[in-house]
Structures are given as C-alpha cells and as structure tokens.
C-alpha cells in the first residue's frame, strides 16, 4: 500500500493562524512576565475568533514599561493570573500556526509561562518580520510601527496587545496577498526553516530598534561587562543571526 501524504506545510490552504501579541513586564529579577495578551485566529481569509485579556504578572511593572505600554499595577491587580487563562490559550491556539511580529519573543515568553506551570507548550511558528523582509524588501525599518507607516497600515493603541495584534493581522493579510502562490509561506513553514530564538527576558523593542546599517555592536553580561564585540554590514541582521535555531 502506498500512502500519499502531503505535509501541512506544503499546502497552506486550510491552515489556521493564531496571530498573537503579548505585553510584558520587561527584564526583572522575577523574569519577564505577561501583562496582556491578544489573539486573533485567522483562517487564511478572515479573522474567525478574538481573545484578549490583561494578566496579573504577580510582580511589579517597571515604570519604564508603564510609560511604554500604559499598563500599570492597578490595571492588572484584579486581572487573572496566567495559570487562570492558560487553558484558554491552549484551546485557542491548538492546531494553529503561531504568528507574531518578531515571533520568537512572544512565543518564548508564552512558552516560559507554560514551562513554569510544567506544561510543554509547542506550536509551529511564523514570523511577519521575516515574511515582510522577503515579500516587501528594501524598507528602512521592519519594526511594526515603522513598517505599518511605510505601507499604509493603521496602527492604533501601539504597545497594547490588541492594537498590535490587529495591525499585525492586517500586515499578515497583505503578505498573504503578495505571496499569491504561497511559495514563501510554504518555505517558511517547512521544517528546518531557520528562525531567530530571541531571549524571552528582553523587550522585543530592543530588537526593533537595532539599526540596519554598517557598524560595531557588543553584548554585555548581567554585570554590564562586555563579553563580545562584533562588526557587521547590517547590524540588525547580524545580531539576530546569533540567535538562530541550530536545529
């Protein structure tokens, strides 16, 4: 008997996508914890489900993060803790491709929240930054705000989970249209496609702000001591290459 099996990544029709954004506490002694999450489930044609919740991070939100997101301790004081919404996140994202702008930041933060609960959360990932670089080349910046401004996508409530998720969804739909034959989506969903695994303890804006020009960069350890110095023609691309999955 011969089985004619087509892996899901060879046919992107019928796939559901969970487009996600999380806001977090940023770096801190107790780690990077989620303060807000938004999920839009997309069937490749339209949004079919929405989910949003503030989350009590069980730690103080730094002032700098409150200035960035507008989320403060009072807003999340009565919000559910992550373990109270974990079942919702699992159910909503089951059988979906996990999509985000700089996907590994959001994915790793959520993955760590589940790991702390002893649950092995795993989903296939798709990054709208990588897709945009491939399908809309040559832009000066691929941060969500500047990218949306460049191509005319409205972005309201910047640095709030639902605002960023709605903008990412509009970007995602544009990318789907640009990839009419789905060759790029297929190649990025193919097992073995390299993705940068961003450290979950760093705010994703740090990576958004990296310049795409020639220069020198360096890494510091937790004591602020320089542990690595590099040079690159494209600083952002080179820095991200340090975090590519090796598998």
PLM regions with names:
Residues 176-247:
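A positively charged, amphipathic N-terminal helix/segment that binds anionic biomolecules
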Residues 1-33, 163, 167, 171-206:
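DnaQ-like (DEDDh/DEDDy) 3′-5′ exonuclease domain used for proofreading
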Residues 1-4, 72, 127, 131-190:
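Extended, hydrophobic interaction surfaces within ordered domains
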Residues 110, 131-132, 239:
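A generic structural signal for short hydrophobic patches within well-formed alpha-helices
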């Amino acid at each position: 008997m011969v089985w004619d099996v087509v892996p899901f990544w060879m046919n992107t029709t019928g796939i559901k996508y969970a487009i996600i954004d999380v806001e977090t506490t940023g770096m801190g002694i107790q780690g990077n914890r989620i303060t807000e999450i938004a999920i839009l489930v997309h069937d490749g044609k339209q949004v079919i489900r929405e989910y949003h919740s503030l989350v009590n991070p069980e730690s103080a939100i730094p002032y700098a993060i409150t200035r960035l997101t507008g989320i403060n301790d009072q807003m999340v004081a009565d919000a559910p803790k992550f373990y109270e919404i974990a079942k919702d996140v699992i159910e909503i994202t089951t059988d979906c491709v996990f999509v985000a702008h700089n996907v590994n930041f959001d994915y790793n933060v959520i993955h760590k929240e589940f790991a702390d609960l002893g649950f092995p959360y795993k989903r296939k990932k798709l990054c709208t930054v990588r897709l945009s670089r491939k399908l809309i080349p040559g832009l000066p910046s691929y941060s969500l705000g500047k990218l949306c401004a460049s191509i005319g996508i409205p972005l309201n409530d910047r640095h709030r989970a639902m605002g960023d998720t709605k903008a990412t969804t509009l970007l995602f739909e544009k990318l789907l249209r640009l990839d009419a034959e789905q060759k790029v989506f297929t190649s990025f969903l193919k097992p073995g496609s390299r993705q940068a695994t961003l450290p979950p303890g760093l705010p994703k804006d740090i990576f958004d702000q990296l310049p795409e020009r020639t220069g020198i960069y360096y890494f510091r350890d937790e004591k602020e001591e320089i542990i690595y110095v590099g040079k690159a023609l494209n600083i952002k691309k080179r820095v991200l290459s340090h975090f590519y999955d090796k598998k």
